[in-house]
Design a protein with these regions (language model features):
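Helix-loop-helix hairpin linking two adjacent transmembrane segments in secondary transporters
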Residues: 1-43
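Paired small-residue
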Residues: 155, 166-174
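Interfacial helix-cap and linker-helix signal at transmembrane-aqueous boundaries
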Residues: 4-14, 103-104, 135-136, 221-229
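Structural signature of the two symmetry-related core transmembrane helices
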Residues: 143-158
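Extracytoplasmic gate region of multi-pass secondary transporters
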Residues: 74-119, 123-126
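Juxtamembrane intracellular "pre-TM" segments in multi-pass secondary transporters
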Residues: 45-81
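Intracellular juxtamembrane helix-capping segments at the cytosolic ends
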Residues: 181-194
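A late C-terminal transmembrane helix in Major Facilitator Superfamily
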Residues: 193-230
């Protein structure tokens, strides 16, 4: 949303100061809303934890005195979760960094239009996060993550098809909307899936792997484009998205087997 607001102020008023002020006011408003609604978040978290315990979804792996001895990477389901984090951040960065180059070089769209469309891709992520923030009160994170992944794959599929240029914009927006619930959903599910006592250490690993994806996958796209052509951009994005879906579903399968074994 920030790039869209800033570009609008620069285009209409030839000044960045108004855009800077508008973004600052939005950020302060969000902070105020979060502070006011903190009690609500705590009540929702407590009720959700109670519901998961009653449904047998909450699993504790160790007693408190054994926490330091646990190898979190050895817990079943952790490794495919880390792969999903790596691919998520890699895809988000790759689309943001190379999407405009694909639009200009392959779709023959002007640089100004391409930049605006990529801003709308980020706008899709922002809008998706706002929407899922409310939906998550009623819908399980696992469902949101899965739906988001299917939406991203649909968006990448649109980029692959020989459709009019306007459909490329739809594809980028769908990818942004689909990506929105995945990252926060995976983070939020960590204590439930792998135990509260393991979550702090495991989230640290998840952050490290996520930044690794942001660091290395976009340059990989650049190397591939240099050696071949930017026409491969949607194919590579689709490959990453499908691999992320398979990794996330692998975790669900492992958790399902564990729940059945517990019963």
């Amino acid at each position: 949303m920030g790039p869209i607001i800033m570009s609008g102020y620069i285009a209409d008023h030839n000044s960045w100061r108004g855009g800077y002020l508008a973004v600052s006011l939005i950020q302060f408003s969000l902070v105020l809303i979060l502070l006011v609604t903190l009690p609500l978040w705590k009540r929702v978290a407590a009720s959700r934890e109670l519901e998961r315990r009653q449904n047998g979804e909450y699993v504790e792996y160790t007693e408190p005195e054994e926490r330091s001895k646990v190898n979190v990477l050895g817990i079943k389901g952790v490794k495919p979760t880390l792969i999903a984090f790596l691919l998520y951040c890699g895809v988000e960065s790759t689309v943001g960094l190379w999407g405009a180059s694909y639009l200009v070089g392959v779709r023959q769209i002007t640089a100004e239009t391409a930049a605006g469309w990529i801003s709308l891709y980020y706008g899709g992520i922002t809008a998706g996060r706002l929407i899922t923030g409310f939906i998550t009160l009623k819908v399980h994170n696992r469902i949101l993550i899965r739906c988001g992944q299917f939406i991203t794959i649909a968006g990448a599929g649109i980029l692959l098809l020989p459709l009019p240029d306007a459909f490329s914009l739809i594809g980028f927006i769908l990818i942004g909307l689909g990506l929105a619930p995945i990252y926060p959903g995976l983070i939020h599910e960590t204590p439930t899936r792998f135990g509260k006592e393991n979550s702090a250490k495991l989230i640290g690993y998840q952050m490290a792997v996520a930044y690794t994806g942001s660091t290395f996958l976009p340059p990989l796209m650049g190397v591939i484009a240099t050696k071949t052509s930017m026409i491969l951009f949607p194919f590579l994005v689709l490959f990453f998205l499908v691999a992320m879906l398979l990794s996330a579903e692998k975790v669900n399968i492992v958790l399902g087997k564990r729940k059945q074994a517990g019963n």
